[in-house]
């Protein structure tokens, strides 16, 4: 069915759950995974450039460290399950394009990603990046949604 699954992550809890699901699917299929996180480039929104001399370098260091942290979590999940895993941090202006390009460039035959991530109001129904990947990708997409609480769990919580 699938031999190589791409698992995008933004470090959110739902993204981590999607990675676990993707790793479980890969294990069941005897597939491997590639985990990708996308770092957007530094942008200057202020006209006072003298205040920003160190900002691009600091931003780059921060984003590299954050990406490494997200990828390390995913690699550990895959290692515990015994699933072969590659990890990549891609810098790109548009995360959805980076996800699609990574899937194509690395020969992935499926993308499994969370229904939404960290990005504000647009993430309430279906994340904007997820929607763009669904709209533009020729690689099949599996969208992971957080499971709803069971009636027993809801009753126990009240």
Question: Residue spans of the language-model regions?
Answer:
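Small/aliphatic-rich secondary-structure junction motif
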Residues: 3-54, 77-86, 158
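Short, well-ordered secondary-structure micro-motifs
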Residues: 18, 45-48, 97-100, 123-125, ...
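Solvent-exposed polar/charged
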Residues: 27, 104-105, 135
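Short, hinge-like loop/turn segments at secondary-structure boundaries
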Residues: 50-54, 103-106, 129-130, 157-158
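A short acidic, glycine-rich active-site loop
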Residues: 54-69
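Structural beta-alpha unit
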Residues: 76-111, 148-158
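Glycine-rich, Arg-bearing micro-motifs that act as flexible, cationic patches
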Residues: 110-136, 150-154
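Short, flexible loop segments at boundaries between secondary-structure elements
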Residues: 139-150
């Amino acid at each position: 069915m699938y031999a190589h699954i791409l698992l995008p992550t933004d470090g959110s809890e739902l993204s981590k759950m999607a990675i676990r699901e993707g790793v479980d699917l890969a294990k069941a299929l005897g597939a491997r995974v590639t985990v990708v996180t996308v770092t957007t480039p530094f942008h200057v929104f202020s006209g006072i450039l003298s205040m920003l001399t160190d900002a691009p370098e600091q931003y780059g260091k921060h984003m590299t460290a954050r990406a490494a942290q997200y990828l390390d979590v995913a690699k550990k999940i895959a290692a515990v399950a015994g699933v072969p895993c590659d990890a990549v941090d891609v810098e790109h202006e548009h995360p959805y394009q980076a996800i699609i390009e990574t899937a194509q460039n690395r020969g992935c035959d499926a993308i499994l990603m969370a229904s939404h991530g960290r990005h504000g109001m647009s993430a309430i129904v279906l994340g904007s990046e997820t929607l763009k990947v669904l709209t533009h990708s020729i690689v099949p997409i599996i969208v992971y949604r957080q499971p709803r609480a069971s009636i027993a769990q809801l009753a126990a919580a009240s």
